[in-house]
C-alpha cells in the first residue's frame, strides 16, 4: 500500500475517532455556534467598527462601520478553526502520549508521517465543516452574507488550520501531563482571542499591539477580509497570510526539535 493510501486511511480513522468522541466534537463545533447565538442575538441589528477605532462619541474612526453579525460570523468561524486545529488537537495528542498510545504506534508498521498526516488531515476537515456550519447559521438566523470571496476563504481556512495544527504539536512537549493540557490550551488562546477583538472592537492600543504578535489576530483579520467585512482586492491580504506562514515555520521548527512520543514518566 502506498504512503498516500495509508495517510488517507489514517485520516478516515481519525475522523471516526473524532466523531465518536462527543465531548471533543461538541467543544469544537458547539462553542463557536453557542457564542454566535448569544452575541448574535444580543447585538443583532447593531453595528461595529472594523479596521478602526471607536471615537469619544461612539463613532468609527479610521475604519468601516458594518453590521455586527457581518463581523461576528467570520470571527466565530475563525474561533472554530482554532478550537478544532489547536485546542482539540493539542489535548488529544497529549492524552495519547500520556496513555502510551504514541509510544505503541512507534512500534507498529504505521509510518510516523502517516499518523501525523492523519491527525492534521482530520483536523482540517473538521475546520472546513465548522466554518461552513457557522456561515450557514449566521446567514439563516442573522442574514449575515455568505463569504464574499469563497476561494480566499477556503485557502485562508486551510492555511490557518495547518498553522494552528503545527503550533498545537509544537506546544505539546511543554505540557507536563494530560491533566494540565486543557488549562494550558485555554491559557494560551482565550486571552488572545479577547484582545484580538473576536467579540467586539477592543479599543486599547496597548492590547492591540500585543495581539498583533500572535497568529490569532492575523487569522481573524484574514477571515474578515475573505468574508467581505473588510474592503480588499479579491479577498486577499498578503500581510495576514505572511504572518501566519511565519508562525507555521516557527511551529514546525519547534515540533521537529522537541516533539516527544513518550511521556516523561515513561
Spans of features found by a protein language model:
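Alpha-helical transmembrane segments of multipass membrane proteins
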Residues: 14, 37, 135-140, 166-170, ...
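Hydrophobic alpha-helical transmembrane segments of multi-pass membrane transport/permease proteins
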Residues: 19-49, 69-88, 127-130, 186-194, ...
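Transmembrane helix segments
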Residues: 30, 38-47, 172-217
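Membrane-interfacial helix-loop-helix junctions in multi-pass membrane proteins
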Residues: 60-67, 145-147, 197-251
Amino acid at each position: 500500500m502506498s504512503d498516500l493510501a495509508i495517510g488517507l486511511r489514517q485520516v478516515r480513522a481519525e475522523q471516526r475517532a473524532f466523531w465518536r468522541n462527543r465531548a471533543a466534537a461538541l467543544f469544537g463545533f458547539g462553542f463557536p455556534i453557542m457564542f454566535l447565538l448569544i452575541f448574535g442575538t444580543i447585538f443583532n441589528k447593531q453595528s461595529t467598527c472594523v479596521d478602526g477605532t471607536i471615537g469619544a462619541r461612539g463613532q468609527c474612526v479610521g475604519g468601516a462601520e458594518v453590521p455586527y453579525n457581518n463581523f461576528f460570523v467570520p470571527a466565530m468561524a475563525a474561533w472554530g478553526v482554532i478550537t478544532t486545529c489547536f485546542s482539540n488537537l493539542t489535548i488529544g495528542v497529549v492524552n495519547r502520549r500520556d496513555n502510551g498510545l504514541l509510544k505503541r504506534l512507534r512500534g507498529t508498521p504505521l509510518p510516523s508521517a502517516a499518523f501525523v498526516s492523519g491527525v492534521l488531515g482530520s483536523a482540517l476537515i473538521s475546520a472546513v465543516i465548522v466554518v461552513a456550519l457557522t456561515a450557514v447559521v449566521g446567514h439563516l438566523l442573522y442574514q449575515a452574507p455568505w463569504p464574499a470571496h469563497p476561494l480566499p476563504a477556503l485557502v485562508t481556512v486551510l492555511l490557518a488550520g495547518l498553522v494552528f495544527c503545527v503550533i498545537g504539536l509544537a506546544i505539546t512537549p511543554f505540557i507536563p501531563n494530560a491533566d494540565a493540557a486543557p488549562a494550558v490550551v485555554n491559557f494560551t488562546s482565550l486571552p488572545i482571542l479577547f484582545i484580538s477583538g473576536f467579540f467586539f472592537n477592543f479599543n486599547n492600543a496597548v492590547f492591540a499591539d500585543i495581539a498583533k504578535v500572535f497568529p490569532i489576530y492575523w487569522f481573524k483579520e484574514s477571515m474578515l477580509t475573505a468574508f467581505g467585512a473588510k474592503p480588499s482586492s479579491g479577498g486577499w491580504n498578503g500581510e495576514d497570510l505572511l504572518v501566519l506562514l511565519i508562525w507555521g515555520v516557527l511551529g514546525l521548527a519547534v515540533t521537529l526539535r522537541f516533539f516527544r512520543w513518550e511521556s516523561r514518566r515513561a
